[in-house]
């Protein structure tokens, strides 16, 4: 009887360890995929943005990472669709940032 309980405990422990290792491996793979995707995005940004525009996007990324991510994804889509023919300068990037920020901005109203 005690041996059966001990055997069940060992099996449960092994199952938990196996499940933990699988989750850890899946998490590592997800991190690796995210890093590869970010490297591809960075390479495209170097191609399509002027140095000033890249610098601005980097500063935006520090303050509003979700906005910077949206801008990067929009620019990547435009680049892949062949709609970006010349490098985007700082002024154009400002306009793009303003448009995307206006679309995603939420307005808060406090009623008394």
UniProtKB/Swiss-Prot annotation:
This protein's UniProt keywords: DNA-binding
Entry keyword rRNA-binding: no
One Gene Ontology molecular-function label: DNA binding
Gene3D superfamilies assigned: PDCD5-like (1.10.8.140)
Intrachain disulfide bonds: none
Keyword Ribosomal protein attributed: no
Pfam family, one: dsDNA_bind
Leader peptide range in chain numbering: none
Domain of life: Archaea
GO cellular component terms attached to this protein's record: cytosol
PANTHER family the record matches: PROGRAMMED CELL DEATH PROTEIN 5
Similarity comment: family membership: Belongs to the PDCD5 family.
This protein's name: DNA-binding protein TGAM_1196
Source organism of this protein record: Thermococcus gammatolerans (strain DSM 15229 / JCM 11827 / EJ3)
């Amino acid at each position: 009887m005690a041996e059966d309980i001990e055997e069940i405990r060992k099996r449960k422990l092994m199952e938990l360890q196996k499940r933990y290792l699988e989750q850890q491996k899946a998490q590592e793979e997800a991190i690796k995929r995210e890093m590869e995707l970010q490297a591809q995005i960075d390479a495209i940004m170097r191609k399509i943005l002027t140095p000033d525009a890249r610098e601005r996007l980097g500063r935006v990324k520090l303050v509003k990472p979700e906005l910077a991510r949206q801008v990067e994804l929009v620019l990547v889509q435009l680049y892949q669709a062949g709609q970006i023919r010349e490098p985007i300068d700082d002024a154009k990037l400002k306009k793009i940032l303003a448009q995307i920020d206006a679309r995603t901005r939420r307005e808060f109203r406090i009623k008394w």
